[in-house]
Every structure is written in C-alpha cells, then in structure tokens.
Amino acid sequence: MTNSGADQAGTQPSRLQWGGRFAAGPASVMQAINASIGFDQRLWREDIEGSLAHAGMLAAMGIISAEDEAAIRAGLAEIAEAIAEGSFTFDPALEDIHTNIEAWLVARIGEAGRRLHTARSRNDQVATDFRLWVRNAIDSLDGQVRELMRALADRAAEHAATIMPGFTHLQTAQPVTLGHHLLAYVEMLSRDRGRLADARRRLNECPLGAAALAGTTFPIDRSMTAAALGFDRPTANSLDSVSDRDFALEFLSALSILAMHLSRFAEEIIIWTSAPYRFIRLSDAYTTGSSIMPQKRNPDAAELARAKAGRIFGALTGLLAVMKGLPLAYAKDMQEDKEPVFDAADAAELCLAAMTGMVRDMMPDVLRMRSVAGADFSTATDLADYLVRDLGLPFRTAHHVTGRIVSEAESRGLELVALPLSVMQEVEPRITEAVYDVLTIEASVAARRTLGGTAPDNVARAAARWQETLA
C-alpha cells in the first residue's frame, strides 16, 4: 500500500523539470499519484521518434547547433538501444517517459540534452507521442482484422453450399449456408477496418510545436516536424492541439464496435459448440477442461473474447468520463487517457488472434447442421412465396394460408415436405404436386439468387471476391 503521509519527503525539486520555483519536493503520495512511468513507458519509441524530429527541425532553423543536434541524436540512439535490451532503468521519481528519457540524455551528453526541450512542452510532446502510438496500433490491428477476414472468407468458400439453419430470435427461421453466415462477419469486419482507417486519417495531424497551449516564440517549422513524423499536416490551433483526445476516443469507439462484432461471433461459437446444437467442434488448442468434470471441453477462448468486449467498452466510457468536464487546455486528468487505450488495444489484439485461430481450426458438423436446417418448418416462407408466385394469392393471404398448413403439419408431427398433398389442398385446393419442388432446404437456399442472397453460387462468388481482395 502507498504511504499517504503528507510530511514524507519525495523527490528533490532540483531533479524535476518544473522544480525551479519549488522549495521542497512533493510528498511521497503526491509522487505516487503523479507518476505515469509505470504505463507511459510504452511510449518510449514514439517519444524518441518525436524528439529526433524536433531536434532536426531546431537545427535546421538555427535554434540549436548542428553539433548539439548530433549529440542529441547519438544520445537518443543510445537510449533506444538501452530500453530495447532492458538495461534502461525507469525512475518513478521522474514522473513520466519524457522526463526519464531527457534526464538520461542530459546525464550522458550534458548541456546539449538540455536544449532539446526548446520550443516544446510536455503537453504537445505527449499529444504527439500518443498520436504516433495510436496510429501504429491502428496499423497493427488493421492487419489482424484483415487476417480474420481472410480466414472467414477461406472457410466461407469451403462451405459455400453447406446448409445450416438461419435464425431470428434464436429460433429456426430459414435455411442459409454456413458460407453465407461467415461472410456476414466479413462484411462487418470490413466496416470495422473502414472505421479504423477513418480514425487514422483524422488523427494524422501533428501537435508538435503547439507548446504548452499558445504556441512558441521561436521561429520553428511545424510542417517540417509533421512531415518527418509521417503526419499529413500540423494541427491548426495550439489550444486544440494539446486539449484534444478525440483521436483516442475515436480509436476506442472503433475498437468497441469491432469488439461487439467479435463478441457476437464468439457467442455464436459458444452456442454452436454446445451439446444441444453441435454445429461445430473446436480443437483442443482453443478449449480447456474442468478441474472436476473429466468429460468437459469448454470454449474458453470464445468466452474470454466475449468478455473482453466489456473491457473495451469500459475503456471508451471511462475516457469519455475523464474528458467530459475538462476546460481548455491541458489538465492532469488527461494523464488517465493512456491506460484505457493501451488496455483496449491489447484486448483487441488478443481477441483477434484467438478468433482467427478458432475460425481456421473449427470443424463443422455438416450433417448435423443440415438436419437442424430442415426442422421447425424452415421452408414455410418458400411455401408462401409459391402461393403468391404460382397461384396469385396476395402475400398476406398466402401468409395466413401457410400458417394454417404449418399448424396441420405440426399437429401430425410432420415437416412440410412430408405433409400429404391432400392435407394442403384442404386449406388451399389449388396447390399441386409442384409445391414439393420448393419445400426442400436445397431448393430454398438455391432459390435465393438475388444480390446478397444465400444461394450457394452467390456465396461462392462473394467468397472468391473477398479472397481476391484480401490476398
């Protein structure tokens, strides 16, 4: 537990960037609540990248010497190597990643290191670092979403004609194909990629040079640093530059919708693997057992993917709550922006990997799915369509007639395809033997040839298009 004694001395003010006007250092509890190095050390690559771009611009504008720039570059390269190999010691007393790196730099190269922060504040520095990190995370996650889409498209092509029940209200509705069902998730994930791309496009402006909130008196070239860091342009307003966390919120929003899609699919995997359904079997690689029941094979990977969606939703609502009452410009509340973003990105990365593995690994029970697809009068809509198309009944009348025929079949314990013609004709005398041509599940799926329908040829073409797009 943290000692809350206010009289316990913490870091000496001389060690802190802002210590000049303070006679005493912060209390230990203040130091503990103020430090972010425990989590923002993940920004070390981006912090060094931003500092290299800033130093290059300062030298190009004659604000620091070429010799100082060279020393800064060498020192930052040494720091990067030390962090990468694990020999760099992060000091909580130095609060954050920015101060830790700068303190190490000054200790190694002296006065040149003190010049690096010219025309820069930690406010625009962290905003830049964080945008770079989120941009990298988007690129990485986009690649993972693409891999999951490829796995789904491959399995959809394999099962373009595999018939399964389609559900509404989790009740058997109409026959579809497994390939059609899997491609529905490909479409969802495609929109997720679009949202991530939109978020990336909007975040790709560089706040570096906004300084604390009002800009700087030095003749800097913000376009130069923006270009060096791969941004499209500098941000337009210095106050907005350091106050904005829309990019993080939009990222979390996109991840939340993605996580919702993954959670829905995970729920279906859980249902499909359950004993009453038995549509698919997951391999041992993605299931676990019970400590007491030897027979159990639990779909824990899917259950955890479903659960982690809640963490991602919580990250979004948590950061919205942090930001909702903050006046411009920067407030220390904004230090709480990173952990939810890091946690959500980590959870999404793990869920995508698990879902991709399960999709590639799952073993559908084709015969079981086909058997269930033919039950519960799943071709009743086809009967109603027949009455409209072949007998000229208005659809509402056909719907009513079909309902009566379903009741007759149900009372006899028969599916529609097995119901005698004479029984159907008692309800609608004009029905002929041709009705049986539309009542099989094969006929049902084959007849749905309209754009986006479940006909196997449609599904095969759609799967092939996605495979080509994602290749």
Curated annotation (Swiss-Prot):
Assigned protein family: Belongs to the lyase 1 family. Argininosuccinate lyase subfamily.
Pathway membership, UniProt: Amino-acid biosynthesis; L-arginine biosynthesis; L-arginine from L-ornithine and carbamoyl phosphate: step 3/3
Key words of the record: Amino-acid biosynthesis, Arginine biosynthesis, Cytoplasm, Lyase
Reactions catalysed, as given in the entry: 2-(N(omega)-L-arginino)succinate = fumarate + L-arginine
HAMAP family cross-referenced by the UniProt entry: Arg_succ_lyase
Subcellular location(s) of the protein: Cytoplasm
UniProt-listed InterPro entries: Arg_succ_lyase_C (IPR029419), Argininosuccinate_lyase (IPR009049), Fumarase/histidase_N (IPR024083), Fumarate_lyase_CS (IPR020557), Fumarate_lyase_fam (IPR000362), Fumarate_lyase_N (IPR022761), L-Aspartase-like (IPR008948)
Source lineage: Bacteria, Pseudomonadati, Pseudomonadota, Alphaproteobacteria, Acetobacterales
Protein name: Argininosuccinate lyase
EC code: 4.3.2.1
UniProt cross-references to PROSITE patterns, sorted A to Z: FUMARATE_LYASES
Main location: cytoplasm
Entry's Gene Ontology molecular function annotations: argininosuccinate lyase activity
Gene Ontology CC annotations of this record: cytosol
GO biological process terms, semicolon-separated: arginine biosynthetic process via ornithine; L-arginine biosynthetic process
